[in-house]
């Protein structure tokens, strides 16, 4: 007893590394199933999947969830004989529920269609499980359904929670779009078209970039509160007449490890900026867009990309709203990391501050001054640089607020300020 025994080890390639999302799965990186089997997450085939094997080490690890798709959250059911999980298999820009035996029978898809489902959890002493679900027009609420019956549908056991007077009739269903970046990446996005858009009209367009960057915007209300808020804001902008595109740039999840870990990202070259430009050019190519009236917005990493777009391509982007963005990589929590001078220079060159001389478009900065994720000094420094160059800037600063705003009123004030800013800077003008 008390003797350790190796029953499996990962390979030596980069895709054999500990999977990025394993700590966020709900089931953890490893779990103990029935019949003395162990279940664990791995990206050894380039996608996050679940594997199982005998705890005594007999036999090879068995892939439970095959496909060019990713498992995100999982838990045990039926006395740990069954695994409930959600993934984007067969529907890359949503999440659906699946079940599979720990022994490795073929996976069974439990949900499909226009919904988004996540966080499945078995109900003790029953054959049912609960989960959270949403779709394009309905925010998250809890559902219950039976584990074994793939023909059944989840039944909500809580009502809608819209605030009184919420204009649900003004919500739109976003369309899935896919376009190419300059170096060949397929970039997925969700396109929100105003309900009152008429044939022949040219509307202003707005791009949204998520933070993280290991995130993915979906074709409906998001499972993370920050991005549920962002989805609501994109809906609000569409209701005000803008054509809105939420673009899932490289570095995000959902499209495999090679996409998430693409070379030259962030402070190593900002290669994902190619996806920002591609998104802008995609909007410009649309018949319903005024190509001279394209704005962009985002928070955190999305704020970084917003600032980079305005700094490098004010000819493409007419205005931007930057929420708590990184503006100079080496000055953002860089101390003590023992990074070489060469890489520090590369990080600086990959930052918005190095292109402020070509920044011409107006910008609104939103930041909490107690932000411990992206230091408030990032915004203070960039504002000073832009003022020295007579760039039109506006600021909304929240005293004592953190990165993910704590107060509901802070979110409302930020989003109303952003909408008002776009109304003033992207006023519809005759297209060239």
Model-predicted regions and their roles:
Residues 35-36, 79-81, 127:
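Short coil/turn segments that connect the beta-strands within blades of beta-propeller domains
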Residues 208, 222-432:
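Active-site-proximal cap/loop segments of hydrolase catalytic domains
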Residues 44, 89, 195, 300, ...:
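Residue-level signal for short, function-critical loop segments
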Residues 25, 45-49, 93-98, 141, ...:
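Beta-propeller blade termini and top-face loops
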Residues 1, 51-54, 101, 146:
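Structural recognition of the beta-propeller blade-terminating site
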Residues 213-215, 244:
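Serine-hydrolase catalytic-loop signature spanning alpha/beta hydrolases and amidase-signature enzymes
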Residues 193, 201-212:
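Short beta-strand element of the alpha/beta-hydrolase
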Residues 1-19, 23, 27-30, 41, ...:
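Non-catalytic accessory segments flanking enzyme active sites
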């Amino acid at each position: 007893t008390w003797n350790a025994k190796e029953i499996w080890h990962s390979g030596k390639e980069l895709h054999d590394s500990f999977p990025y999302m394993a700590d966020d799965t709900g089931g953890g990186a490893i779990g103990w199933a029935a019949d003395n089997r162990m279940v664990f997450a791995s990206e050894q085939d380039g996608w996050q999947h679940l594997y199982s094997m005998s705890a005594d080490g007999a036999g090879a690890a068995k892939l439970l969830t095959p496909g060019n798709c990713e498992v995100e959250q999982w838990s045990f059911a039926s006395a740990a004989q069954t695994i409930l999980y959600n993934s984007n298999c067969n529907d890359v820009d949503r999440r659906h529920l699946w079940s599979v035996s720990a022994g490795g029978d073929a996976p069974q898809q439990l949900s499909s269609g226009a919904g988004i489902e996540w966080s499945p959890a078995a109900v003790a002493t029953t054959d049912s499980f609960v989960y959270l679900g949403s779709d394009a027009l309905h925010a998250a609420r809890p559902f219950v359904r039976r584990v074994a019956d793939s023909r059944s549908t989840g039944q909500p056991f809580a009502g809608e929670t819209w605030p009184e007077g919420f204009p649900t009739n003004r919500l739109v269903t976003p369309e899935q779009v896919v376009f190419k970046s300059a170096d060949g990446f397929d970039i997925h996005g969700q396109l929100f078209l105003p309900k009152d858009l008429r044939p022949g009209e040219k509307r202003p367009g707005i791009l949204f970039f998520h933070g993280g960057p290991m995130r993915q915007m979906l074709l409906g209300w998001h499972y993370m509160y920050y991005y549920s808020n962002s989805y609501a804001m994109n809906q609000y902008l569409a209701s005000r007449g803008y054509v809105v595109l939420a673009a899932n740039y490289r570095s995000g999840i959902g499209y495999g490890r090679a996409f998430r870990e693409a070379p030259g990202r962030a402070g190593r070259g900002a290669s994902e900026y190619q996806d920002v430009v591609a998104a802008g050019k995609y909007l410009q190519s649309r018949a319903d867009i005024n190509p001279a009236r394209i704005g962009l917005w985002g928070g955190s990493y999305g704020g970084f990309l917003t600032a980079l777009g305005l700094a490098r391509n004010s000819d493409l982007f007419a205005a931007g709203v930057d929420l708590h963005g990184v503006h100079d990589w080496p000055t953002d929590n860089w101390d003590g990391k023992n990074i070489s001078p060469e890489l520090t220079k590369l990080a600086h060159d990959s930052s918005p501050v190095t292109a402020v001389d070509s920044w011409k478009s107006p910008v609104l900065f939103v930041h909490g001054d107690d932000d411990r994720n992206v230091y408030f000094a990032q915004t203070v420094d960039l504002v000073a640089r832009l003022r020295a160059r007579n760039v039109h800037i506006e600021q909304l600063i929240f005293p004592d607020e953190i990165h993910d705003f704590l107060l509901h009123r802070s979110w409302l004030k930020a989003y109303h300020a952003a909408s008002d800013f776009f109304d003033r800077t992207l006023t519809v003008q005759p297209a060239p």
